[in-house]
Amino acid sequence: QGDELISVLATFPRIILSEINTHRMLSKNTSSSRAIPFNKMVDTIKNDPFIPIAWQKEHKGMQGSEYIKDIDHLKITIDDWLKARDNSIEQAERLSSGFEDELSETDDRIDKVTKQLCNRLLEPFMWTTMLITGPKSGWDNFFHLRCPQYETNSGKGFRSRKDALAAQLGVKDPGKDFVKESYEDDFNIEWFKANKGQAEIHMMALAECIWD
C-alpha cells in the first residue's frame, strides 16, 4: 500500500513557479496566465501586485544574507518596483490595443496582440494558484530542500518561526493564535537574519506556510 496523498492549494508569487516545478515527486496543477482575460489580469496586479517580502542586497552565489533596512531606501525601492509594474501595464496595454492611439481606427493595420503574450509582460508582478499533490515522501523532500532554517541560541534549527518560538517558550502544541500573537510582523528583518536556509526567500516563505 502506497503513501497517503496530501494535497495543498497554494497561492504564491509567479516568479517562483519554475522552482516549484522542479519537484518531480509532487504533481502540480497551475492556473495559467494565458487563460486569464487581459483586462482582468491588469486589474489584479493594479490592486494586488506581488511585492518582494524583503530586499536582499547584491550578493555572490545563490543566496545572500544582507538586507536593505533603511526605511527611506526601502520606500524608494518599493516605489520603483511599482513604477516598473506601471510601465509593464502601459506597454502591455499598447500591445493589446493594437496601437489605436497611433493608428487611425479605420486603418486596416490595427491588429491587437493576443492576451497570451500581453499577459507575459505582467508576470513578474503576478500571483499564481497551484494545487500541489504528493505522498509524504515527496513533501518531506520538498520541506528538506525549501524550508527555512531558523537558528536559535541553542544552536538548533527550525523549519518555521512557529516551531522556533514554541520551543523557546515551551509550548508543546502551538496553534494559529500563537502564530499571530508571537510574530505579527511577518517582515521583521531579524527573522531573515536568523534564517540560514539556502532557498530563495519567497520559496522558503511558501514552504514555511505549508509546513505550518
Go through each PLM region and give its residues.
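A conserved ligand/cofactor-binding region detector
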Residues: Q1-D212
